[in-house]
A protein has these predicted regions:
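Extended cationic-aromatic binding surfaces that line active-site or macromolecule-binding grooves
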Residues: 1-14, 31-43
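Histidine- and acidic-residue-rich, metal-dependent catalytic cores
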Residues: 25-70, 75-81, 85-89
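Divalent metal-dependent phosphate-bond-processing catalytic cores, especially two-metal-ion Mg2+/Mn2+ enzymes
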Residues: 3-4, 8-19, 24, 65-66, ...
Length: 191
């Protein structure tokens, strides 16, 4: 999956080079990845077994969506969930490595975003109106981890501790991290 992501990232750079960078946020890179790999036949350069193409296509398409369609089941759902976990773990490590991605502001977090977070739900990017809410959105991604292995990795590598260390206003985000740490530990021991 990482190989596909690297290839898609390179093709994505080529694709958007002709556009204003403000367009980048409006392009769904999961859908673009599917288009680049399958519509242009690039998949043949990486993988030959056409029996797996639909699983690969769905995994790439849904790795960055807020959820996977309910009617995707069996091996196709497992492949989607593996890709989603891998993508989120990469994002968490990127947030730790590049501290400037966790930028804060002086705004309060809206009631809707707060409620969604404390109900252990993913937050839709369209509902985000501030840098602080973007941090909460990033934290809510932990709710969409699908495998015990992924939760164990989060706990063993102390990802939450490292992210909390990067936050400047620890008091503002303390309850979010405490709640999330409790949820992650529970899921790590129960899955």
């Amino acid at each position: 999956m990482e190989l596909f992501e690297e290839m898609i990232a390179e093709k994505f750079k080529e694709y958007v080079s002709d556009y204003d960078m403000s367009d980048v946020n409006s392009i769904d890179h999961g859908d673009l990845g599917v288009s680049l790999l399958f519509d242009n036949g690039e998949i043949d350069n990486f993988y030959k077994d056409e029996n797996d193409f639909n699983k690969i296509k769905l995994a790439i398409k849904y790795h960055n969506k807020i959820s996977v369609l309910e009617d995707i089941v069996g091996d196709e759902r497992v492949m989607c969930n593996i890709a989603r976990d891998a993508d989120k773990l990469d994002i968490f490590h990127l947030l730790i490595e590049n501290k400037s991605l966790f930028m804060e502001d002086d705004t309060t977090i809206s009631k809707d975003v707060r409620e969604c977070f404390f109900e252990n739900k993913m937050i839709n990017y369209k509902d985000i109106k501030s840098k602080n809410e973007k941090i909460v959105l990033s934290l809510a991604m932990f709710y969409d981890i699908n495998f015990k292995y992924s939760y164990k990795h989060i706990v063993d590598t102390k990802i939450l501790d490292d992210l909390y260390e990067d936050v400047n206003n620890k008091e503002r985000f303390k309850e979010y991290f405490e709640h999330l740490k409790k949820v992650v530990n529970e899921r790590c021991s129960s899955l």
